[in-house]
Amino acid sequence: MKFLDLAKVYIRSGGGGTGAISFRREKYIEYGGPDGGDGGRGGDVWVEAVDGLNTLIDFRYQQHFFAKSGQHGMGKQRTGKDGAGVTLRVPVGTEILEEDEETVIADMTEIGQRVLLAKGGNGGFGNLHFKSATNQAPRRANPGQPGVERTIWLRLKLIADAGLLGLPNAGKSTFLAATSNARPKIADYPFTTLHPNLGVVGVDGTEFVMADIPGLIEGAHEGRGIGDRFLGHVERCAVLLHLVDGTAEDVVADYRTILTELQAYGGALATKPRVTALNKIDALDEQERAEKAAALQAASGFPVLQLSGVSGEGVQDVLRAVRRRIDGARQAEEATDREDTSWQP
């Protein structure tokens, strides 16, 4: 899946400082001549791909990035100080787009990659530059060049093979933390997860990327809760892992709530390959496990796996099932691509 996280950002490079109009004034020197220094250069605006980030959430709280302008020139041929630049730190996989959200300025695909977004203005010349044989005392200096101001979009594309679905507090983050190197926030209350978390999951010598999607509630496709903004991103997953809280009073109702949201959202979301699992079985006795798993299987029409993200019971079986579905989905996609690219007379 490709998570698209958009952020609108306003940037402005620094303007150049104005050149100085100044004359040498020293004792016993009657005609000192011009000594005005140049203005400092304005700061640049850069974007850099860094490690350790997987979201553009920081740009939600700060949208304006302005570099400093260069200082004005001074007497005694002193050049003004250059303005400080600004660097936007973004995750790898971020696209930089023009204001139209279509034209790509840069694609940040490697750690350490830097791209200049707005160049600072040059500083203006001081009057020292305008001295000539016919004008020994010029009273002229150049203003600095203005900075560049523009509006850009940042669009993050993170790749995940499988997405975790479930109601809030279904144990998705615990499962991801138990099976991968991800460390999502975990607590015993709903909506602990506020944005997707990615983790690399290993099983039987193979790896795939799994995303923990914020919990969905009834009416999420209409904008309720916090899951509506992620339903479109889940649509791009190859496989969905639907975790149902085994401690819930009615597991079938919980299952159908998520299924209804997928169907109401439209598209191919409801028909996407899906693995259903009964979670938190460590809190159930054998009879409760069997009854709830049977009810869930009858409602879904597919085999239902059982697991506990806390104790680890059944986790490997679930991962293997997800791995098989991912392989099947990729093979089907490759077959479709071959059909699309086949020559037609």
Swiss-Prot record:
UniProt keyword Metal-binding, yes or no: yes
Classification via PANTHER family: DEVELOPMENTALLY REGULATED GTP-BINDING PROTEIN-RELATED, MITOCHONDRIAL RIBOSOME-ASSOCIATED GTPASE 2
Top-level class of the enzyme under EC nomenclature: hydrolase
Gene3D superfamilies: GTP1/OBG domain, P-loop containing nucleotide triphosphate hydrolases
Gene Ontology CC terms, in alphabetical order: cytoplasm
Gene name, Swiss-Prot/TrEMBL: obg
EC number: 3.6.5.-
Cofactor(s) the protein needs: Mg(2+)
Biological role: An essential GTPase which binds GTP, GDP and possibly (p)ppGpp with moderate affinity, with high nucleotide exchange rates and a fairly low GTP hydrolysis rate. Plays a role in control of the cell cycle, stress response, ribosome biogenesis and in those bacteria that undergo differentiation, in morphogenesis control.
GO molecular function per UniProt: GTP binding; GTPase activity; magnesium ion binding
Subcellular localization, as worded in the UniProt entry: Cytoplasm
Primary localization class, coarse: cytoplasm
Name of the protein in question: GTPase Obg
Keyword Nucleus: no
Matching InterPro entries: G_OBG, GTP-bd, GTP-bd_Obg/CgtA, GTP1-OBG_CS, GTP1_OBG_dom, GTP1_OBG_dom_sf, OBG_GTPase, P-loop_NTPase
UniProt-annotated binding residues for GTP: 166-173, 191-195, 212-215, 279-282, 308-310
Signal sequence region: none
Highest taxon above the source species: Bacteria
Keyword terms of this UniProt record: Cytoplasm, GTP-binding, Hydrolase, Magnesium, Metal-binding, Nucleotide-binding
The protein's assembly and partners: Monomer.
Organism: Dinoroseobacter shibae (strain DSM 16493 / NCIMB 14021 / DFL 12)
CDD domains recorded: Obg (cd01898)
Residues covered by the Obg domain: 1-159
One BP term from GO: ribosome biogenesis
Family: Belongs to the TRAFAC class OBG-HflX-like GTPase superfamily. OBG GTPase family.
